[in-house]
Amino acid sequence: MSEITRRKFLHTSAAIGLSAVSYTRVAQAAVAGGRPVIGFVGCGGRSKGLLTGFRDDAIVAWACDPDKKRAESFQTASGAKQVTADLRHVLDDKTVDAIVVATPDHWHAPAAIMACDAGKHVYVEKPCSHNFREGRLLVDAARRNKVTVQHGTQSRNNRLIVNAVQMLQEGIIGDVLVCKAWNVQRRRNIGHAKPSATPAHVDYDTWVGPAEFMPYQSNRFHYDWHWWHNFGTGDIGNDGTHEIDIARWGLGVAGLPTTASAVGGKYYFDDDQQFPDSATCVFQWPGNGKVGQQKQMMFEMRIWSKNYPHNCDTGIEFYGSKGMMFVSKRGKLSVWDDSNQPIVIRSPDETPKLPKNHQVDFLEAITAGRKPAAEIGIGHDSCSLVHLANICVRTGRSLNIDPKQQTILGDTEASKMLGRPYRAEGHWSIPNA
């Protein structure tokens, strides 16, 4: 990547280093002794799921969605006072402390960046970005404005997962060197469709937002947008982000790997999906180059099967110098020694106190001025692996990466995919470096 292009992706280390962060901005409502006031941006099924965790500890002021029916339905469910299709109305409201971003992926980072610049705290669903560049810009916006941004990787507040990672860190299987994560499930065929008239209750221009404009088409709108390059990140980004995050956490790695490889394709579905229905991804971190310091992560995805490893649709195997651990957010945890004999699991003597859910962790973080469990720097590191894997699959090539410079080496096409093309005519939400 050229130096000019590289500078578009980078900011000073002080702006992005966790050690340089001071979480000093607290919610206005907290200062006044009340509950934080929040606005929901994106009012589909995911927002309704998140609402359960926010309901008792925050006041919902806004329901924002370009689908009027969804916005009004969420208003009824949440008690929100106001409805809008335009995010800017929410950000202009000085009484709002934070927003919850549960939009399609292509809106995640643009909406969150605008919120940070408006002085709002942000809970952003996974993946936090549609592409690597926007993830970097979101981290920078959070640091620059000293606001709290929580990433929607809820396992960071899951007691079983937290305990499992602590056991790994305490050496239950020795030095953790390799892990394999998976997400296997049977999704539906989205069929073949053609552009058609936009439903009257939908502000489709706002829905497309900063992305390249594509005419309305039924199988790239609600939920099915996941499977289109322009709007989603495929199932590596959709569900895979959760397993990749746990795997990275347990493996004990931060930042970018030095190599990323992935193969995948459409092996099962004959439909309009652009992302693969099957993929196998591998990432490597060199550590200090010595034996015992190098790390490897594998991730497998199949969205057409019900044959699960360990009879579990999602999970991670960790391989260490003294044994192996299997853990799943479905409530499963097993450990074996290096002779494949089961190890009796005993929870760590001292474990961190966890909030009642991931949403409350966010609210407590903004009222206390502390970091949440899935602080945006953590979220971006995990989502970066998603983006690298998708680039590998789309180009059909492995990638060599410079972690310090945050660049892909010797591959102009892949380097361009660290960002994305935007609307030719421009849009008010397009993030700028």
Language-model features, listed with the residues they occupy:
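N-terminal secretory signal peptides and thylakoid transit peptides that target proteins
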Residues: 1-16
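N-terminal Rossmann-like dinucleotide-binding module
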Residues: 13-78, 155-158, 247
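Short glycine-/small-residue-rich Rossmann-like dinucleotide-binding loops
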Residues: 14, 103-104
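Nucleotide donor/acceptor-binding cores
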Residues: 34-36, 147, 177
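Conserved SAM-binding strand-loop segment of SAM-dependent methyltransferases
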Residues: 82-86
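N-terminal Rossmann-like NAD(P) cofactor-binding module of classical short-chain dehydrogenase/reductase
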Residues: 99-100
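Beta-strand-loop-alpha-helix segment that lines the small-molecule cofactor/substrate pocket
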Residues: 104, 109-157, 171
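Contiguous beta-strand/loop segments that form the cofactor/metal-binding neighborhood of enzyme cores
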Residues: 163, 175, 180, 186-234, ...
